[in-house]
Amino acid sequence: MEKFNPGICEIQKAQIVPFGAALDSEQAQDITALVASFTIQQSIDSTAIRGNMFLLDNIGFIERLPLRGEEELLLEIKSFDLGTVRRLKAKIYKIDDVQRSESGNGSTYTLHFISKLSYEANIKYLITSFNNVRGDKAVEKIFDKNYSKITPENEFKKDGQIAQQPYGTRVFKIESEKERLFFIQPTYGNMRLTIPRYSPAEAIAFVANRSFSKDQYLSSTFRFFETWNGFYYVTDEWLNDKAAISKNIPTLNYNTFSSRDPVDAALQISTIQDFRNNRRANVAEDMFSGAYTNTF
């Protein structure tokens, strides 16, 4: 229990693959020992998983490889609460703060990365239009063409049983990363729209701003975001329903202070110390983007 801490995780493995090289080639380099610190961010307000690493390089790795951007980064991360291990395929898109180390015999710098799927999808732009198509169907087509091929699939629990989904949810397997899924909530009504040279993520956000649901509940809070488990095109109400029907989601409690004593392990895992909703409602934005409709 000496390593128990819900707020801490470590990189068990970090491997860089130069642009154009194969994962199993001799060019792939393990940089785990160089990582001094790192952060990873995922949010329902973000279309992609992002992060950065601070490296202490005493072997001249930055010039020996060399690091130029667009390298593939493979991460294996373990948490100090339940020992959960997560793996992420990412792409390096920026290298900055390069300077001489305090010891004078090396350098320090920061690598910025984004999930590989989001990176490769959003280095291009698309101009397209949809006529008499539901919003969720348009999103499915944009994702299938620009992110990865997707096929209908079920979400499975750890015991092998099929996981229950909120009303009407369509679940897809992401073929390029088969362990991940894409969850799409149905929208109401058909739309006509032209996408004017947006990246795929911007295009889906454009559709989201014009989408609303009606069958299960009235809502215009559609979001497109990425997590460890995959991608989501859903409303805030869908997230509430998903939590309510998923028995494997633990009950969490809000408290500004949480004990760090390993004896209080259960309490630490179930405590939220900061909670906020940055996007509750914005009628002006919804009306401007077309997410409102008139009924007579």
Question: What feature does the model see in each segment?
Answer:
Residues 12-15, 27-29, 41-42, 99, ...:
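Residue-identity detector for glutamine
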